[in-house]
């Protein structure tokens, strides 16, 4: 891959209704700035009109040392490509981040794994200057061995290989 954002391949024939439900983030590539640390779980829904919405939670540290569970909300605007959305997101509390990011589904089998990608800022050379990505699993225990290779190949294709950190699930957000 030449790492041009405009050349990144996304999921073909993406089926939003099969994508709904709960996904556990098992790895993430961070953007610049405040971000969810771990215990990240996302829930996607599609309403009667076909609109996609999502909620997510995860552990954050704000004000340098205050640890809390952040609840986030997002609405998805369709684009001509069914696997590419514009996501407007905000937090349940005013001090959490708000924004408008691309939300691309790079690949998924709907039942086990999904690879998400978002480039916030494209560099002058067409590569991604600031972006983030989640590797999602339907299982809190992580990816199945047979999905690992596919995911590694896709990380390479989106030029984020070696930039991911594991996302732990300790139940932090369940208790709060």
Curated annotation (Swiss-Prot):
Cystines in this chain: 3-159, 69-173, 119-128
Localization in the cell: Secreted
Gene3D superfamilies: 2.40.128.20
One Pfam family hit: Lipocalin
Residues recorded with modification N-acetylserine: 1
Annotated function: RBP delivers retinol from the liver stores to the peripheral tissues. In plasma, the RBP-retinol complex interacts with transthyretin, this prevents its loss by filtration through the kidney glomeruli.
Protein name: Retinol-binding protein 4-A
Source species: Oncorhynchus mykiss (Rainbow trout)
Lineage: Eukaryota, Metazoa, Chordata, Craniata, Vertebrata
Gene name linked to the record: rbp4a
